[in-house]
Amino acid sequence: MVMTDPIADMLTRIRNANQMSHLKVLVPASKLKLEILAVLKKEGFIKDFYLPQSSREIIISLKYAPNKERVIKGLKRVSKPGLRVYASAEQIPKVLNGLGVALVSTSKGILTDAQARLSQVGGEVLAYIW
């Protein structure tokens, strides 16, 4: 099966596992996905992720609040293969007035909207997470 949008597939797998209160989710591995997951972990949206040596799949540990409430309320893919969305540093949108995070692919790697604005770099707006 050929996957046309692997990032959307990863976000959908996370969203579905999150809605069903699963603790872990498996996604096919790639360098871009590992960068995105590193940002999600740093921002506190996921607990952890790791890539076993013998496997080609990333294991993502999802994060929940003490009362089993989901930490990730929503995920939305913005830039798609059929319609790419680019923004300059000044045009990068705030998600829910700063309560969410926009993932931006820049020349400095995958950054959050706040980091991209601070670094004064624009790029492709990959997704919104809140």
From Swiss-Prot:
Keyword Nucleotide-binding in the entry? The reply is no
Q: Which domain of life is it from?
A: Bacteria
Q: From the Swiss-Prot or TrEMBL record, what is one GO molecular function term?
A: structural constituent of ribosome
Q: What are the record keywords, sorted?
A: Ribonucleoprotein, Ribosomal protein, RNA-binding, rRNA-binding
Instruction: Give an example GO cellular component term for this record.
Output: ribosome
HAMAP family linked: Ribosomal_uS8_B
Task performed by this protein? One of the primary rRNA binding proteins, it binds directly to 16S rRNA central domain where it helps coordinate assembly of the platform of the 30S subunit.
Subunit details for this protein? Part of the 30S ribosomal subunit. Contacts proteins S5 and S12.
The protein's name is Small ribosomal subunit protein uS8
